[in-house]
Amino acid sequence: MSALEHYMYVLECGDGSLYTGYAVDVEARLAAHRAGRGAKYTRSHAPVRLAAQARFFSRARAMSAEALFKRLPRDRKDALLAQAMGEPFEEVLRRELPGFGCDTAEEFVCRSLACSIDVGYRDFMARLMPTVDPSRVVGVRTPVLRAIARELAWRPDAPSYLRALPHRLFEEMQVHAFAIGLERDYDAALALYDRFLPHVDNWATCDQLPVKVLAKGPGRTLQKVGEWLASGYCYTVRFGIGVLMRLYLDERFERRFLDEVAAARLPGAPERPDPESHAYYVDMMRAWYFAEALARQEAAALPYLLARGEGALLDEWTRRKAIQKAIESRRIAPELKARLRQAR
């Protein structure tokens, strides 16, 4: 049983009666019933055995199935349970219960994720994102998440998924991010970014949020970047810096962008941010920006990495991190790397 799954289950009690319930972990719930910690009904009608369980991908769907099943006459319940001996109970219910309906957009996403879980990849990703509770990571690779987002975008109920924030799982947030990247209308995309960014809680979702559509309105996007940099929220600030790095280091570059990124620190940020703090994730992006700017706009960016002491243009921690990233880059000439090493 995974974090994506919700269950409706049916117990047969000692006197032959049936008890129907909802659970995210049927085995644990069954153990509770058998130990007398379940419902009053099962305590007074023990022992119990599991007659069937139906897997769904939203709590609402599982509880709806429970309610619909409870209202059936006993002979109808027995007929459905008999069918469940030869096929998944959820398929029986989906086919036989009136008004059951099709998957919602949320259920489509969760069902799709459940088909592609990689436990090893889950553990790998959880280690890379210390700000995310590991229980919120199920382990689905990025190409699969992009494919799910493309399918989601074609669904008529996709807007309902894009309104349902925040999503519980990291991968649900990733699908949402990639779906935003498929929006071609500039104004619609801006609204989606503004709705989504306050709920981003890790560097991976922030950095993989597509920005291509923002190039359609470079002037308005710059105004929006100014709002994001001034937001005071870690991943909104980080995203704003990322937009400047990805869209404004070519012919759109202006020297003032360097000053804006240099000033884009969180309120009260320490001189040496803790690796698990919000300040760390903003300052690391600032360092990345200056290393990238050095590769693409060397004359303008170099003074920020060389200046120290009273004439410094960057805080010392970010300056050193930017130098480190630049030295590691294959796009920086050896002669310049040597100069940077002397400036550390």
Please report, for each region that a protein language model flagged, where it lies by residue.
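GIY-YIG nuclease catalytic motif and its immediate N-terminal context
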Residues: 1-56, 60-77, 81-100
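Alpha-helical scaffold domains
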Residues: 97-344
